[in-house]
């Protein structure tokens, strides 16, 4: 009921708002179906149920666009997931999917509209998301990349002007990050090992 009230409040405050909800695969088909029948018009629901089979059943019951996120992102091989009749839109998050090239290849493979979104990264990761988004000739849905404000501190500024962001070259500023030198080295080494594996 709280979630339905929140949606109603957003709709009341801004009737033009595009409303998206993200469930992270936590609903059963019945829960999703009942909620979506009551919530009114939304742009889409992201990963309402966990499995492809559940998503397929839900899609046959409701007239709401369904986005697949975890169903691909957490798969050992997202190219082998059969999305036929299960979702309408693919969620692309650069880092969890293995980089810009792989995310783009995944979109081409599944031949569905995409939403390019962040996985709550710093400005560096969001810049990669912007680069992926810019590589598509056309996007049917707005990107979900305006998440930098959710971080207490960021390594660079990526301003949003009139609802738009620009791909930006910048030198990251790590001074404001609250982390120990040991932890910073651990992350740096992990990134270097990962980069080596991807070569």
What role is predicted for each listed range?
Residues 1-64:
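Metal-dependent enolase-superfamily TIM-barrel catalytic cores that perform enediolate-based chemistry
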């Amino acid at each position: 009921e709280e979630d339905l009230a929140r949606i109603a409040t957003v709709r009341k405050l801004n009737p033009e708002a595009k409303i998206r909800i993200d469930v992270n695969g936590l609903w059963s088909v019945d829960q999703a179906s009942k909620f979506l029948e009551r919530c009114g018009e939304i742009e889409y629901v992201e990963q309402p149920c966990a499995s492809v089979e559940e998503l397929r059943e839900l899609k046959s019951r409701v007239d709401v666009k369904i986005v697949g996120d975890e169903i691909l992102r957490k798969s050992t091989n997202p190219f082998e997931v059969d999305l036929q009749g299960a979702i309408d839109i693919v969620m692309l998050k650069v880092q969890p999917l293995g980089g810009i090239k792989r995310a783009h290849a995944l979109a081409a493979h599944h031949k569905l509209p995409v939403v390019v979104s962040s996985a709550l990264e710093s400005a560096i990761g969001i810049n990669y998301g912007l680069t992926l988004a810019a590589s598509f000739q056309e996007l049917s849905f707005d990107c979900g990349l305006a998440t930098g404000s959710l971080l207490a501190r960021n390594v660079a500024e990526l301003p949003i002007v009139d609802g738009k962001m620009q791909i930006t070259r910048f030198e990251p500023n790590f001074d404001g990050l609250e982390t120990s030198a040991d932890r910073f080295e651990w992350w740096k080494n992990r990134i270097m090992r990962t980069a080596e594996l991807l070569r």
